[in-house]
Amino acid sequence: MSWLFGLNKGQQEPPGVPGFPEPPSPPGGSGDGGDKNKPKDKWSNFDPTGLERAAKAARELDQSRHAKEAINLAKVQEETLQMEQQAKIKEYEAAVEQLKNEQIRVQAEERRKTLNEETKQHQARAQYQDKLARQRYEDQLRQQQLQNEENLRRQEDSVQKQEAMRRATVEHEMELRHKNEMLRIEAEARAQAKVERENADIIREQIRLKAAEHRQTVLESIKTAGTVFGEGFRTFISDWDKVTATVAGLTLLAVGVYTAKNATGVAGRYIEARLGKPSLVRDTSRITVAEAVKHPIKITKRLYSKIQDALEGVILSPRLEERVRDIAIATRNTKANKGLYRNILMYGPPGTGKTLFAKKLAMHSGMDYAIMTGGDVAPMGREGVTAMHKVFDWAGTSKRGLLLFVDEADAFLRKRSTEKISEDLRATLNAFLYRTGEQSNKFMLVLASNQPEQFDWAINDRIDEIVHFDLPGLEERERLVRLYFDKYVLQPASEGKQRLKVAQFDYGKKCSELSKLTEGMSGREISKLGVAWQAAAYASEDGILTEAMIDARVADAIRQHQQKMAWLKAEGKEGAKEIGKNPLQPLLEGTQV
């Protein structure tokens, strides 16, 4: 019933309980009316209105039919309040218990901190004591070292003093000995001079007698030799048979010396032309005596080897492959029928397979090949003409026929009218033109150049076939990537002898992707890319070539290729912007494929 007395005003009144009207205010209830000067008692401000309302409400509640429910509701509210108070008491007790636990935890934390601080103090004290002990030990060592150094210094001073005393003693002894020696020499010289002065007449007489005897001996020797040679020459002249035999012998000796000298030169030149290798030739398949002695097994295999396909290992575009195959067949048939060989000019960017095809062409035709570079001609100077004639003389002695491949031919076969070339190089060029003026059945001339427009017109007149080697296309690049990936990666990994393994990924798909990324690269650059993959595998810790390593090497090669192209463009070379452009299109229009 707390709500009757104004308690729990915030709570809602129970349903079913009628509201009680407020009683009217009694007259004069206000404390303001009346005389202000009258003394006030303690009940002067008491308002009985609340008691009246409570009494009235109690009477109405007793008379109401909901009285019992109201009483029960009041009891329930009182029990609820009691339970809330008990809950608050429990919460207070829990808070007190938590506070006690917190105090215990704080005390334990303080105790732990105290123990840690004591431990730190003990450690600091121990470290300080150890530091003091180390300092004392270091001071002792320092003092001991200083004492040892002082003792050593004293010993050195003592040794130096003893050495100085010994040196002074030796010097004094040597000085005394020198003085005694000088006195002795002086005494001997004086005695010798005295003796010579006393015996001067005797000495002069002895010298005079010796000179007279020597002069008499020389004169007698001259007379004896003249007599002997005179008698011999007189005897030789008087006998004409001896004179004739002597003249004939001297003549035969001179003829023999001259013949041996010239025969040796002729034999040397013959051996050099037949068995040796000219200085301008860098590489050749012809068998030399030195090579046969060094590598007999290799030479035997070469002699009994079968004829190879001209395009084995050479990857070209279908049109170019068809053309060079026709050239290979024609060359082979020319050799078989002992006809005249045709001269070929191969031009195009570097690394497109010109040198490789020349070697394969020689092997396919059963011919020997010899490779020379144009850059080796200019440094020879005056010897260039002789060296050039030696090359062609040597080429003419080949029984199987020789394919003479001149790489970088534009280095010395330049235009004589416009290019500034030396007289020696001009003479060498004239010798080359003289030896290639007519077609031969002994050798076949193959020129390779990156700038064929710089050739002398006489060189172009000696060319029978012009072949353009362009950069590989997408299909050719994919074949090249697969070829070198198999050669430098898969084959070494499958052999098991080398430290190289390949991770698991789709090799064919990767080769197709790389062929698209390597646009603009030559066959040589792609082959170097295969070598780079192999080197990357060897350089790794486990020797496994992963796909990421392949991509990294390809990206590096692409950057290097772009840098090279930028350098070519900066140098102003015409072939850098359009590297696949055909500079000899007017000449090729009239050439049958």
From Swiss-Prot:
InterPro entries listed in its UniProt record: AAA+_ATPase (IPR003593), ATAD3_N (IPR021911), ATPase_AAA_core (IPR003959), P-loop_NTPase (IPR027417)
Membrane disposition: Single-pass membrane protein
GO biological process, any: mitochondrion organization
GO molecular function, one term: zinc ion binding
Keyword Cytoplasm among UniProt keywords: no
Keywords of this entry: ATP-binding, Coiled coil, Hydrolase, Membrane, Mitochondrion, Mitochondrion inner membrane, Mitochondrion nucleoid, Nucleotide-binding, Transmembrane, Transmembrane helix
EC number: 3.6.1.-
CDD domains attached to this UniProt entry: RecA-like_ATAD3-like (cd19512)
Subcellular localization: Mitochondrion inner membrane; Mitochondrion matrix, Mitochondrion nucleoid
Biased composition (Pro residues): 15-27
GO cellular component terms attached to this protein's record: mitochondrial inner membrane; mitochondrial nucleoid; mitochondrion
SMART domains recorded: AAA (SM00382)
Annotated region described as Disordered, given as residue ranges: 1-64
Biased composition range(s): Basic and acidic residues: 33-44, 53-64
Top EC class of this enzyme: hydrolase
Record-listed ATP binding positions: 348-355
Pfam families assigned to the protein according to its UniProt record, in alphabetical order: AAA (PF00004), ATAD3_N (PF12037)
Family recorded in the similarity comment: Belongs to the AAA ATPase family.
Entry domain remark: The transmembrane domain and a C-terminal adjacent region contain all information necessary for mitochondrial targeting.
Task performed by this protein: Essential for mitochondrial network organization, mitochondrial metabolism and cell growth at organism and cellular level. May play an important role in mitochondrial protein synthesis. May also participate in mitochondrial DNA replication. May bind to mitochondrial DNA D-loops and contribute to nucleoid stability. Required for enhanced channeling of cholesterol for hormone-dependent steroidogenesis. Involved in mitochondrial-mediated antiviral innate immunity.
Assembly information from the UniProt record: Can form homooligomers. Homodimer formation at the N-terminus may be regulated by ATP and is required for the interaction with the inner surface of the mitochondrial outer membrane and correct mitochondrial homeostasis.
Name of the protein in question: ATPase family AAA domain-containing protein 3-A
Species this protein is from: Xenopus laevis (African clawed frog)
